[in-house]
Amino acid sequence: MNEIELRLARLRELMKREHLSAFIFPSTDAHQSEYVADHWRGREWISGFNGSAGTAVVTMKSAALWTDSRYFLAAEEQLEGTEYQLMRLKIEGTPTIAEWLGKELQDVQSPEVGLDGMVNSYNYVKDLSYSLRKLGGITLRTNLDPLEQIWENRPSLPANPVEIQPLEYAGETLASKVARIRKSLRKLHADGMLVSALDDIAWTLNLRGTDVHCNPVFVSYLLIESDKVSLFVDDNKLSPEVKQYLQDNQVSLYKYNKVEKCLESYSEYNILLDGDETSYYLWKAVKCQEIVAAGSPIPAMKAVKNKAEIEGYRSAMLKDGVAMVKFLKWLKPAVEAGGQTEISIDEKLTSLRAEQKLFRDISFDTIAGYAQHGAIVHYEATPETDVVLKPEGLILIDSGAQYQDGTTDITRTIALGPVSEEMKHIYTLVLKAHIQLELVKFPDGASGTQLDAVGRECMWREGYNFLHGTGHGVGSYLCVHEGPHQIRMEWMPTPLRAGMTLTDEPGLYLAGKFGVRIENTVLISDYMSTEFGKFLQIEPLTLCPIDTTPIDVDMLLPEEIDWLNAYHHSVYEKLSPFLDEEEKIWLENATKPIK
């Protein structure tokens, strides 16, 4: 038996004792986070799949894992040798979890499926319960966390220190943010709200932490009432300075595990709960007169950056651009000298970023995919998969950093030497898609779905496509993936507004061959106002040359060439003052106009 088989056997012994026919393991934590602390990585522990998105479902005789297109290839590799069947989300023929369970449990009498109500959202449990009852009378049990019994040496809850995010970077006081939130609550006829999302809590309080790898958040809950603000957090996270700061801002402190008791005795008439962010367990704990089921107003506020945050982004992008130029100048000669691998170049890039002022951490684990690994959208090199780089072909490097004044996210695909005509063609198609999105002008309030087609059209014309989103929101020294705004094919109703930060990251992936992705972090800014309304534009924030050696110039339109040359001129003008002479010469060559 391998390790995963042993874990499944222990789970099934527990399921048998508890009279459960199946158990569901999500990728989330008690706060519905995308990236979670080690304590909540139960889906990874039970399946061996370490992607940030996915759901494992185990019955007494079978097991399956659902994940999205970013992880199809990685999941195939990681699930190999286990009994898990890979379920590819949004691919025709893939059953839903409820459909699969309905079929797997059709011969089981009075089947009961378990899940932990503390790490599954209220809306998810409600919808799944309805689907299971409709399909075959399957009931849900929500009061069991099997990991507490079967996961030996399970990591404890994180207890890392919390720090104050200075006003010079936050741009708005805690008191001002709370006042805006209360104003929104009054419009929704709510007396208070529970905030579960960790980045929403950090943003509201102008605090940051290190409880989650690469994400400057801290495990906590926040209860905002009409006349009181309560933070539920373990006391040992807070220094005397942070405690005084919270006291000065009239924030009351309670232990993290007291949130349920507080909700049970909540004295206001009603409370707003976001069904996508609030766990099923806490939703059911509320005993007030009325629950206002509505989306939290905080993400929309957080999405529109203020002047200080935008200036922070510009400063962070300068620092990150300097680190990237130093790295790219080093990369090809180092590969030609021999001995460099996907892991070693990742370490080099992180070390160069760490030299920059206000560097705190990377913003996600670097994706450095050489050759066929570049086709694995969210590839992460391990000692088992790491390969030596050769002075030929393409390497895709998706990386980012957390600086105290801003978060960065950038992808560059680099030709390490000679490339094939197919590589040039695919690379140029991706570049065209990237540029077309940066060129677009659009009405204030347009959706990300409308913009998504602009970038993809040149690919669609040739029968190519990619299944991940074209762009996601980016936090301000917060999570690198931030909502509610996105640019993607699926309908996204959130209107795009000036001040929002996003990524522009189209890609194409040829399984077993190579992958190409080009990504800038961008800012939505004002373009013009006419009798037809206000119009917006996309402004690149990322400052880093785009490799021109794999470009088939004949494929580019004049406006695309003009954009690339203007972008490279800006990159050189802004970064060169911070470089030494050799680095300036390298950057000047890397940003030469193409014709």
Feature map (PLM): residue ranges:
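Active-site neighborhoods and metal-handling regions in enzymes and metal-associated proteins
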Residues: 1-595
